[in-house]
């Protein structure tokens, strides 16, 4: 396991002193490789906390460029980076947040085989996309490689998060998407409040850190929903669908 430098020990001191986390947890983060898919609102929010917390290797995957309408909620981008690939804009911002980590941008739209190969190189994947087809593609790749997937979504004033560990008897994302169909609304059509994105992205980062460090209990086997209008959280148990084409028997 990678050892922390003196600078890193000072930088991450407030995490290292947490009971049950300690140096082992911080070194586990430094050793970890996380793939973040989508560098829009959720990806920006989640990645900056993974970077600042000391996750040692981040791969950023997106094929989009920064536009002016993104800046309301995509906090790593700026007026100066409008027109740039999102992964490059995000890489530069994250490097300023933490120069001690390695960041690899991948500005591409990958096919199933390419995505599966990339997933297999990582310890955990964050789904920060807004497209059900891409989410299903990610789920299939993560299930095949048994790489945990932390999935988040946010629209209007509502958000949700789920962790898929792919353990025996656990559901997968396809079990969830089968319940709601393929035609999910996007922020372009329905709108979204900026801080809601930060709440859900931060929850994704927290769940990722817990999984990577073996710290706490992940939000697996359930959907955690947040209603920003009333500031209320609720949970719904998510069962594995025996007829699921990905994880079903």
From Swiss-Prot:
Substrates-to-products reaction catalysed: [molybdopterin-synthase sulfur-carrier protein]-C-terminal Gly-Gly + ATP + H(+) = [molybdopterin-synthase sulfur-carrier protein]-C-terminal Gly-Gly-AMP + diphosphate
This protein's UniProt keywords: ATP-binding, Metal-binding, Molybdenum cofactor biosynthesis, Nucleotide-binding, Nucleotidyltransferase, Transferase, Zinc
Annotated pathway: Cofactor biosynthesis; molybdopterin biosynthesis
Outcome, altering residue 175 to A: No zinc bound and no enzyme activity
CDD domains: ThiF_MoeB_HesA_family
Effect of substituting residue 172 to A: No zinc bound and no enzyme activity
Quaternary context: Homodimer. Forms a stable heterotetrameric complex of 2 MoeB and 2 MoaD during adenylation of MoaD.
Family in the record: Belongs to the HesA/MoeB/ThiF family.
Protein name: Molybdopterin-synthase adenylyltransferase
Organism: Escherichia coli (strain K12)
């Amino acid at each position: 396991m990678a050892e922390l430098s003196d600078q890193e020990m000072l930088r991450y001191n407030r995490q290292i002193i947490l009971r049950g986390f300690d140096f082992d947890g911080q070194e586990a983060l430094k050793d970890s490789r996380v793939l973040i898919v989508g560098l829009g609102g959720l990806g920006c929010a989640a990645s900056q906390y993974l970077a600042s917390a000391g996750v040692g290797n981040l791969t950023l995957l997106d094929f989009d460029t920064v536009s002016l309408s993104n800046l309301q909620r995509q906090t790593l981008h700026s007026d100066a980076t409008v027109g740039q690939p999102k992964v490059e804009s995000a890489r530069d911002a994250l490097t300023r947040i933490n120069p001690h980590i390695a960041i690899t941008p991948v500005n591409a739209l990958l096919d199933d085989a390419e995505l599966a190969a990339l997933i297999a190189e990582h310890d955990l994947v964050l789904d920060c996309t807004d497209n059900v087809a891409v989410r299903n593609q990610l789920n299939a790749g993560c299930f095949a490689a048994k790489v945990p997937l932390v999935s988040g979504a946010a629209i209007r004033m509502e958000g949700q998060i789920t962790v898929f560990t792919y353990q025996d008897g656990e559901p997968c994302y396809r079990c969830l998407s089968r319940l709601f169909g393929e035609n999910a609304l996007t922020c372009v059509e329905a709108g979204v409040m900026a801080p809601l994105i930060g709440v859900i992205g931060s929850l994704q980062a927290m769940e990722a850190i817990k999984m990577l460090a073996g710290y706490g209990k992940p939000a697996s086997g359930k959907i955690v929903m947040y209603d920003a209008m009333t500031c209320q959280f609720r949970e719904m148990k998510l069962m594995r669908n025996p007829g699921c084409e990905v994880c079903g028997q």
